[in-house]
């Protein structure tokens, strides 16, 4: 049986715009960089998730020193402290490296944590003894892709640029979702906010209007890849 080439993956690659926010034709989504909307969306999701994790802490912080001034230390609940925000922001963009490119999904949904369906399919083929040639060693398959590395760098840039806005939200506007306050209110023009409305349902639509689970699609992809060896010049990091 011949090696499975990247061309077979074109059956499951989808379409979306590039960093400038300008939509492209559907044929062009196999190789692209994340949009500004996608960067802001993931930054907001990661920060709110981390703050949600620490929000129920009953710890009380003591601030200031008594010494000879006669002033008492201030007691501030950790849940509303600047310390909590600083700790949530620490290594925030590093956590973006936990994401993978799920090329079988549309738009901003292609960026999600965990192994992509496509990569799971390819590893399943390898376990079955099929020779899969991605042009890189097997041990490098799980390294962060160019897209994810770009996401992380742009996250750092955006966080530095809008640090004061994030602080304003934390101390004064937490009744609003951060995604709305930061991305829609400060980072993006109204014409570039479409990705914020995209949500993942866990199911994919197929042509006859029925729905297919990821497990069913993975089995079908393995069968297609096994039976249809094709050559391609596409970057393996799109997986």
Swiss-Prot record:
Region described as Disordered: 199-239
Biased composition (Acidic residues): 213-225
Ranges of biased composition (kind: Basic and acidic residues): 201-212
Localisation: Secreted
Molecular function (Gene Ontology), one example: signaling receptor binding
Listed name of the protein: Protein canopy homolog 4
A Gene Ontology term for the protein's cellular component: extracellular region
Main location, first listed in the record: secreted
UniProt entry keywords in alphabetical sequence: Disulfide bond, Secreted, Signal
Gene name of this polypeptide: CNPY4
InterPro entries per UniProt: DUF3456
Signal peptide: 1-20
Parts forming coiled coils: none
Family designation: Belongs to the canopy family.
Bridged cysteine pairs (disulfide): 37-195, 40-183, 93-155
Free-text function comment from the UniProt entry: Plays a role in the regulation of the cell surface expression of TLR4.
Assembly behavior: Interacts with TLR4.
């Amino acid at each position: 049986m011949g090696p499975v080439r990247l061309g077979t993956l074109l059956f499951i690659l989808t379409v979306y715009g590039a960093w400038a926010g300008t939509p492209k034709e559907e044929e062009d989504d196999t190789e692209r960089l994340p949009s500004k909307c996608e960067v802001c969306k993931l930054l907001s999701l990661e920060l709110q998730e981390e703050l949600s994790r620490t929000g129920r802490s009953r710890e009380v912080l003591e601030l200031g020193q008594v010494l000879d001034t006669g002033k008492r230390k201030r007691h501030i609940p950790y849940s509303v402290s600047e310390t909590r925000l600083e700790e949530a922001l620490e290594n925030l963009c590093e956590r973006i490296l936990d994401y993978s490119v799920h090329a079988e999904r549309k738009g901003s949904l292609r960026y999600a944590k965990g192994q992509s369906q496509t990569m799971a399919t390819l590893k399943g083929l390898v376990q079955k003894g099929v020779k899969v040639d991605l042009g890189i060693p097997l041990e490098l398959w799980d390294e962060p892709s160019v897209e994810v590395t770009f996401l992380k760098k742009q996250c750092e840039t955006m966080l530095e640029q809008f640090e004061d806005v994030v602080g304003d939200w934390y101390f004064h506007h937490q009744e609003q979702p951060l995604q709305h306050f930061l991305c829609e209110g400060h980072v993006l023009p109204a014409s570039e906010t479409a990705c914020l409305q995209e949500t993942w349902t866990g199911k994919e639509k197929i042509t006859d209007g029925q729905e297919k689970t990821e497990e069913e699609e993975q089995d079908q992809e393995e069968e297609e890849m096994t039976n249809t060896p094709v050559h391609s010049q596409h970057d393996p990091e799109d997986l």
